[in-house]
Amino acid sequence: MTAPQPHTITPPTPGSKIVLIGAGDVGIAYAYTLVNQGLTDHLAIIDLDERKTWGHVQDLNHAVPWSHHNTRVTVGTYEDCRDAAMVCICAGAAQKPGETRLDLVAKNTAIFKTIVGDVMSHGFNGIFLVASNPVDILSYATWKFSGMDSSRVIGSGTILDTARFRYALGRYFDLAPTSVHAYVIGEHGDTELPVLSAGSVAGTSIHHRLEMIGESADEDVDEIFVKTRDAAYEIIQAKGSTSFGIGMGLARITQAVFSNQDVVLPISTLLQGEYGFEDIYIGTPAVINRQGVRHAVELQLDSEEKERFDHSANVLRKVMGEAGLI
């Protein structure tokens, strides 16, 4: 597939109107967080199940009086994309028990081609936020199908994996997760990796803290990461889907965009030479502001981390090639 022809780069549509496409568990968790935090003045929800969507819209509107915000929630159509500041895509085939995120490629790429085409044909000029799996590949597909500048297409990437890892490390060190600064990068999936070499806990490097604990600490952290990586499978087995963690992560990205925060978050974005790769969406820290992705932040990886990142990127490249995206 040839590279997309970007639109002339103009400022994204102002305001805070959001069109949410896909009212499943993830989409509605995101919608509830938007209403609760007052991150949008108008949320339009599009889903194939119009009756259920109507029910969600009524339920969310009934939460507004206690939110201290004046959010309007409506059943949306693609016409709503014309003046939307953001379109968040949570639609697509869901991950089933025992199914990997990469197993969803063919089904969801076809779905996305239709969705993104409908969004763009209605004059959308905002920022895409992609949450459907496999998110790195579908973020790349959204960039290709839309013709948008890559800064306008943000994937949720490893924002949830990083949250899970920080939470677990916080429990291990008996500290609040907000005192843990460590990233999970790479594919949002089985080949992701933690970057311990650049991580810190309460201002001290993670490696130093582990040395203070003793020999068993490295094995403990390895086990923590494995549980982080495989958490989705266990949660899906238990309750059918993951929703609250990713809903909050999507809201955090939305806040960073609409508040022009220039904050570093672990998302999926296009690499343009970082880590030695180009033309691939993958999880990495990046600076987020009102224009979307200002730039990716390349972490300094040790040799083992670099080898694992290269493997993750090459796995994604192989699947993208098989799907006809590159």
UniProtKB/Swiss-Prot annotation:
Cellular component GO terms, alphabetical: cytoplasm
One of the Pfam families matching this protein, by short name: Ldh_1_N
Compartments it resides in: Cytoplasm
Name of the coding gene: ldh
PANTHER family with a match to the protein in the record: L-2-HYDROXYCARBOXYLATE DEHYDROGENASE (NAD(P)(+)), L-LACTATE DEHYDROGENASE
Highest taxon, organism lineage: Bacteria
InterPro entries listed in its UniProt record: L-lactate/malate_DH, L-lactate_DH, L-lactate_DH_AS, Lactate/malate_DH_C, Lactate/malate_DH_N, Lactate_DH/Glyco_Ohase_4_C, NAD(P)-bd_dom_sf
Active-site residues (renumbered): 188
Activity regulation as described: Allosterically activated by fructose 1,6-bisphosphate (FBP).
Protein's GO biological process: glycolytic process; lactate metabolic process
Modified sites of kind Phosphotyrosine: 233
Disulfide bonds: none
Reaction(s) catalysed by this chain's protein: (S)-lactate + NAD(+) = pyruvate + NADH + H(+)
Function: Catalyzes the conversion of lactate to pyruvate.
Pathway named in the protein's UniProt entry: Fermentation; pyruvate fermentation to lactate; (S)-lactate from pyruvate: step 1/1
The entry's keywords: Allosteric enzyme, Cytoplasm, NAD, Oxidoreductase, Phosphoprotein
Residues reported in the UniProt entry to bind substrate: 95, 101, 133-136, 161-164, 242
EC number: 1.1.1.27
Family the UniProt entry places it in: Belongs to the LDH/MDH superfamily. LDH family.
Residues binding NAD(+), per UniProt: 26, 47, 52, 78, 92-93, 114, 131-133, 156
Protein name: L-lactate dehydrogenase
GO MF entry, a single one: L-lactate dehydrogenase activity
Entry binding sites for beta-D-fructose 1,6-bisphosphate: 166, 181
